[in-house]
């Protein structure tokens, strides 16, 4: 997989913006991506050194449309911690 295929989008929530001070950045990633692939993708795209990657999997939620039921897509979220000497990712500047 290409680095741009692994990292889908940043996750911007109140919780994710509060941990930016600790140099932790939150991304939605491909469901098949491993921690190592996420690390290399972030290092390649943003030119930073990654110290740690934490990953969470979310199941799809049940949604109904009248009598028809289905599920939303499952998601995978990664919290990437960069090293102290790395520059800040400008993507998240507020």
From Swiss-Prot:
The protein, known as? Large ribosomal subunit protein uL23
Give the matching Pfam families: Ribosomal_L23 (PF00276)
Query: InterPro entries recorded for this chain?
Result: Nucleotide-bd_a/b_plait_sf, Ribosomal_uL23-like, Ribosomal_uL23/eL15/eS24_sf
Q: Which UniProt keywords apply?
A: Ribonucleoprotein, Ribosomal protein, RNA-binding, rRNA-binding
Q: What family does the Swiss-Prot or TrEMBL record give for this protein?
A: Belongs to the universal ribosomal protein uL23 family.
Spell out the molecular function terms from Gene Ontology.
rRNA binding; structural constituent of ribosome
Q: How does it assemble?
A: Part of the 50S ribosomal subunit. Contacts protein L29, and trigger factor when it is bound to the ribosome.
Species name for this entry? Listeria monocytogenes serovar 1/2a (strain ATCC BAA-679 / EGD-e)
Query: Does this entry carry the keyword Ligase?
Result: no
Annotated function: One of the early assembly proteins it binds 23S rRNA. One of the proteins that surrounds the polypeptide exit tunnel on the outside of the ribosome. Forms the main docking site for trigger factor binding to the ribosome.
**SUPFAM superfamilies with a match to the protein in the record:** Ribosomal proteins S24e, L23 and L15e
What processes in GO biological process is this protein linked to? translation
Gene Ontology CC entries for this record: cytosolic large ribosomal subunit
Keyword rRNA-binding on this protein?
yes
